[in-house]
Amino acid sequence: MRSDATRNREAILRATEELLAAHGAEHISLDRVAAAAGVGKGTLFRRFGSRTGLFQELLAERAAALALAIETPGSALGPGAPPEDRLTAFLDELCELAERNLALFAAHERACAEDKYRDPTYLRWHAHVTALIAAARPEGGLDAEFAAHALLGSFDADLARHVMADGGVARLKSAVRGLAEALLEGAATPRTRR
């Protein structure tokens, strides 16, 4: 990427962050972002394509460290740790990411509402959580893909905001961990089907 393109990208992403922090997701237009970044609207469109593309790119940037950690051996999130531990560590990190970026999560959800299950960041998170659940319960008993959707649904911005309003990120972590444990323990417990 050329240096001016890199500079413009950074200016646009930082302007988006500032507008989200100051005004929330409802008041962010591409015109406002372009003006705040000091670039033309055409520059913004060429780089991101749409408001959805802009929020997808910003979330991907915010989640980049998490993406790297899940691939790094030796970290609590990385290969080599037991899948249950990796799942808990990943969910804890998502809780932290949600707390720091709640306005971005809300903006991203609204922008991607038509097709949120095809968003690149969501797809990476879903594939990772699905693989960890499947590794934790190789004997089956749990639809790992559906369970991953259920766990990731805990990071809906409105739900996360509501849960964190009384107990902060510690409550969100506890609730999400409890859900993950219940799903995994329930899958390990044989039961008769009706």
Task: Describe each model-derived feature in a short phrase.
Residues 15-19, 57, 69, 93, ...:
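Short amphipathic alpha-helical elements of helix-turn-helix/winged-helix folds
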Residues 67, 89, 96-100, 112-138, ...:
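Amphipathic alpha-helical packing segments from all-alpha helical-bundle domains
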Residues 11, 53, 85-89, 93, ...:
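Amphipathic alpha-helical interaction segments
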Residues 1-23, 27-36, 53-56, 61, ...:
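Basic, helix-initiating cap at the start of DNA-binding domains
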Residues 38-48:
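Short hydrophobic/aromatic patch on the recognition helix
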Residues 71-73, 106-115:
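Short linear capping/connector segments at secondary-structure termini
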Residues 97-100, 104, 131-135, 149-169, ...:
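Amphipathic C-terminal alpha-helical segment
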Residues 60-89:
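Amphipathic alpha-helical linker/stalk segments
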